[in-house]
Swiss-Prot record:
The active site is at H37. Catalyzes the condensation of pantoate with beta-alanine in an ATP-dependent reaction via a pantoyl-adenylate intermediate. Pathway: Cofactor biosynthesis; (R)-pantothenate biosynthesis; (R)-pantothenate from (R)-pantoate and beta-alanine: step 1/1. It is an enzyme of class 6 (ligase). It comes from the Bacteria. It comes from Halalkalibacterium halodurans (strain ATCC BAA-125 / DSM 18197 / FERM 7344 / JCM 9153 / C-125). This is Pantothenate synthetase. InterPro entries: Cyt_trans-like (IPR004821), Pantoate_ligase (IPR003721), Pantoate_ligase_C (IPR042176), Rossmann-like_a/b/a_fold (IPR014729). Beta-alanine binds at Q61. It is found in: Cytoplasm. Keywords: ATP-binding, Cytoplasm, Ligase, Nucleotide-binding, Pantothenate biosynthesis. GO terms for molecular function: ATP binding; pantoate-beta-alanine ligase activity. Belongs to the pantothenate synthetase family. CDD domains: PanC.
Length: 283
């Protein structure tokens, strides 16, 4: 595995890959890798000759008072995991390397950001698409792989690629879970022992909503309330949101007559976790 810490080194290595006509799959991450990230690498390796992973904690997507400074980081650990999984090129830039001067251009997302995480994190997805587009320009991959645990991010990035005619295929990949159903997340390490025992209740509550939907309930408000009640019964932290939205348009709906996303965000003492289920219409 080749580790590149500068843009020039990355681009020099990628020129070699292109000269050899090798296809490139890209897995962008913020590090502190877990099985969810590694499952993206596995998928990329199945479909491409070369796999590039980036590890960069992007300051543009963190707002005031958010967890930029405390976001878990362990590059030595991440490097070992990436190499063991078969990553070919690991791009690990500093903030100064990615943003050597104050930005004169920043993308602004105008659709699908006033709900879910975007509602309480103004500017978050502007920062996400800005860094993702920059990484796409640097890596020029054939395809990029994203986990559906953050389905809103997948939708926003997909829309950005379509709107700007970016020549990168977006490959959404299923959420990877612990055996008890908790979605794999870098923030899980910040849960207390008690919170870790409660946390699978996020997924269980989503399943309760899915069960009501499967039983024939089409009123989105009823589904939301069923999920909320389940969360209140199972967990002792604070509900950030419970939503039932169209997907991938992320529009509020009253009746469920299309593919929807059931989504929750929950605030524990030192970690905010999100989870979701996408329910295709007719299933």
């Amino acid at each position: 595995m080749i580790v590149c810490t500068t843009i020039s080194d990355l681009q020099a290595q990628l020129r070699i890959e292109r000269e050899q006509k090798r296809s490139v799959g890209f897995v962008p991450t913020m590090g502190y890798l877990h099985e969810g990230h590694l499952s993206l690498v596995k998928r990329a390796k199945e479909e491409h000759d070369t796999v590039v992973m980036s590890i960069f904690v992007n300051p543009l997507q963190f707002g005031a008072g958010e967890d930029l400074d405390t976001y878990p980081r362990d590059f030595a650990r991440d490097e070992q995991l990436a190499e063991a999984e078969g990553v070919d090129i690991l791009f690990y830039p500093s903030t100064d390397e990615m943003y050597p001067r104050p930005a004169s251009v920043r993308l602004k997302v105008t659709q699908g950001v006033d709900v879910l995480c975007g509602a309480s994190r103004p500017g978050h997805f502007d920062g996400v698409v800005t860094v993702v587009l920059k990484l796409f320009h640097l890596v020029e991959p054939d395809a990029a792989y994203f986990g559906l645990k953050d389905a809103q991010q997948v939708a926003v990035i997909t829309n950005m690629v379509e709107d700007l005619n970016v020549g990168v295929q977006i490959v959404p990949c299923a959420t990877v879970r612990e055996v008890d159903g908790l979605a794999k997340s870098s923030r899980n390490v910040r849960l207390s022992e008690k919170e870790r025992k409660e946390a699978p209740g996020l997924y269980q509550s989503l399943l309760a909503g899915r069960e009501a939907l499967d039983a024939g309930e089409k009123d989105a408000a009823v589904i939301r309330e069923r999920i909320r009640q389940s969360l209140e019964e199972r967990l002792t932290g604070r509900i950030d949101y419970v939503e039932v939205l169209s997907y991938p348009r992320l529009q509020k709906i009253e009746r469920i007559e299309e593919t929807v996303i059931l989504a929750v965000a929950y605030q524990f003492e030192n970690a905010r976790l999100i989870d979701n289920l996408i329910v295709p219409y007719g299933e």
